[in-house]
Amino acid sequence: MAKSFFGTDGIRGTVNTESLNSEIALKLGLAAGKIFTRGNHKHRVLIGKDTRISGYMLESALESGFTSSGMDVFLTGPIPTPAVAHLTQALRADLGVMITASHNTYEDNGFKLFGPDGYKLTDEKQTEINELMNRSDIMSLQDKNQIGAARRVDDALSRYIEFAKASFPNSMRLDHLKIVLDCANGAAYKVAPMIFWELGADVIVIGDKPNGRNINQDCGSTKTKALRKKVKDENADLGIAFDGDGDRLAIIDENGDQVNGDHLLAMIALSLKKKNLLKNNKVVSTIMANLSLENYLDSIDLKLIRANVGDRYVIEEMLNSGSNFGGEPSGHLIINDFSTTGDAIISSLQVLSLMIEENKSISNLTNLFPLISQKHYEHISDDKKDISNSHLENLSKEMKEKIGNEGRVIIRKSGTEPLIRVMIETNNQNLSNEILDAVSYTHLTLPTKA
């Protein structure tokens, strides 16, 4: 039976297990290399990575696969995922690969793949690569005269720094703003402080000392306790946390409170609408976006379009609907005028420009509407395939009937981790507890998400 290597966001797994190892990296390089060397021009692939210790091992295997297939390889070293998307376009590469497991801890790693246009590869293209990776003749190699070469891109960081700064209005500076950055000991640890410092901010940095094993460890966009404390201790204007690969953010206001992702989406959408910059009056988010966001956008004559969970699906729906703004409540924000993928640095610069334009604190800017209560639960499953899609669909249908018009229930498999995720959205807490109990009786033991 053919193995499925890809999830909802490329390939991801625990390093040196059957889910992710050097052999898989080599096969990926060989398979993708065969597909992206079609045509007569000299073919290039750009490879970036975050700061995980396994990145060296996987980079070497991936490089070997690509050069064996006849592609020249550009190596950037540690760099944010959106920088890989940008540089793939800028260097006229056929393909870009980011070695990362995003917000996961160092034991995991993976690959995100970008086409020559800077957008993540489609499901169809990933399926084509997956099929080649499963073939017995995957090791058929190019002629010795067609082997590719590899080189370092020494100015990769400086190229991305200038690209990100170009998204910030030329007439603005960040003078008089004190900002705390949490770089998650990840891919943004060099570029993020430099960008904000060059734009004039008083920058305080934590999570900027990666050692290969501390990426996302009690830091970053999913673990903001240290950043929230630092913002209060330093009396800062705000805090910004990035995840391990720099495509996702969390914002901490001047009071040390984390800004809800739905409020961030609403704030930016409102600003774009006021400036007549929001295309087709549409905002794209996911099925996880709060119902109160949809109601608020409707009240200002904007339409919320919901996509499946995952920033690549948000981007696909943005392109299909003609919208130039979308994102996930989890912190992936995409402004298509600036970037082809989620970019935490560029998104945070847009938040800062709004603060300066409106002369308001971030807490005032995001105080737009009350949220409907959402509770999130997770069931850890070593093999999600043990729980059938039909079982989850039937369970979801049953729970939706139970909650009726008082809210929403979403039960789904995570596309990047061995988890079944449950979201219950209602202000009726008794009903929420009843639904959780009912779900638990279906043989899913669901610990509360920390």
Model-derived regions: residue spans:
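An N-terminal, well-structured beta->alpha segment
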Residues: 1-64, 68-69, 153-177
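Gly/Ser/Thr-enriched, mixed-charge loops and adjacent short helices
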Residues: 14, 109-234
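C-terminal catalytic subdomain
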Residues: 323-362
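Short amphipathic alpha-helix segments
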Residues: 387-402
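Proline/glycine-rich low-complexity loops and linkers
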Residues: 127-162, 166, 254-329, 334
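Conserved small/polar residues in nucleotide/adenosyl-binding loops
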Residues: 442-448
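Gly/Pro-rich interdomain helix-loop hinge
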Residues: 354-383
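N-terminal small/polar loop signature for handling phosphorylated ligands or for N-terminal nucleophile
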Residues: 34, 38, 44-108, 194-252
